[in-house]
Amino acid sequence: MMSLVTAADLKAWISRGGELAILDAREEGEFGHGHLFWAVPCPLSKKELRARALLPRKATRVVCVDGGEGHAQKLAAYLTSLGHSDVHVLKGGTPAWKEAGYTVFTGVHVPSKAFGEWVEHHYGTESLDPPELQALVDSGKPLVILDSRPMDEYVKMTIPGSVNVPGGELAYRIGDMVPDAETTIVVNCAGRTRSIMGAESLRRAGVPNRIVALRNGTMGWELAGFTCERGQTRTYPAGTPKSADLALQRATAFGDENGVKVISRAAAEELLSDESRTTYALDVRAADEYAAGHIPGFRHAPGGQLVQATDQWIAVRGARVILADDDTVRSRMTGAWLRQLGGWEVYVVQEASKGATVSGPWKPQVPEVKPATTVTAQALAAEKGVTVVDLARSIDFRAGHIPGAVWAVRGRIPKIEGAVVVTAPDATLAHLAAAEIPGARVLEGGVAAWKAAGLPVAADRQTPPDEACVDWYLRPYDRNSGIEEAMKEYLSWEIDLVHEVERDGDSRFGAW
């Protein structure tokens, strides 16, 4: 069943607790211009993939929202067609929410970012500004700078001399990387909250060093007149750290303090088979570890990103979350923060690496896919008069695409005369889109296969232009103009989130 719900009723549902997912049917770029605090992007263009990942239980109460364009009704109808039984649409969408006097938030990953700011206020995380860091570097005193972002962000720009250690790895790796207590540890990100969360993770774990967050990250560094390094790949040593036992002691204390429960694989399977509750199964290790082998059914969600971009993986408030890694260190640290962020019931799998595993990425089953005819990169390169439609993220299309390709969002592909070949980072998405274009084929292996074949790639930072990037909420560095002003606005936005959250009243950070 699908029904309309008023803003007042939805507000009451949020306050009441229990399982609830609020899915916004717009593209991320549109979503970022104004949305509900607990809303999670589930754009129509990727609904078959996102809905199955975000809603593992079909009896969960779901409210679909949009900006008043009618997308929410389409998403709700799709969910109903899949068998979801408690689906609603917010009457009037986000505009009606605002008209009712409730807070509308801009930006993305808002609960996670607001939580990071709360952590700094609550725990008194020490920070230093860029000139202070430069003075510390110049002093010659023992110092290590750790960049807590994923490697793809680190490569683009980082603080000179820093080493990439994503947030979920920090407490696990720190004993090997900084074995003495005299070295000052500085954690940075691009802005504020991942620096704060990384530094505070080390402090909560009981690391005895002086630990500080770089205030305003790489943005603040460049705004202060310093230059970032680009193209660096420095990172932590691979494999299990020698100090893993110490890391486990530290993580156990933090996890226990925050109510993280440890269970066996058999118990995890029982929870996952319980149809009365929504249960997420997430593996918080690094991507290469996950790909090499993981528990069947567990999605990859690197720990630091799971805490700071939670809505990529978790949509249901009141759900259970099961985390896995090799020795529970990363799971316990991640789980403790998830408990404080959203009060989810968190479990950690003991001896997760023992027993059956599968390799490769997690992929949802999408039975409605009708496989299209495929074409290899070499064959496509030899053809004439073919239009390639690329469904990659707009910022990825800018960085590299097949010459002459047209960038588009599924569902908004312009009418094209003649032969069409669709490519997308996800093959399922490519086949879904091709089925909506008469006669369209799919590029086998996507642009990655094109590059692997040694074929030419075009790059153009202006295409698509900023205003056309509806699929991606542009970060300051993604923009083609006004970058410095955008950085200042972003940093101010993060700082003010704590106050906006207080005004909204729909969150309760801390111990649950």
Residue ranges and their predicted role:
Residues 1-21, 25-144, 148-280, 284-387, ...:
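Rhodanese-like catalytic fold shared by cysteine-dependent sulfurtransferases
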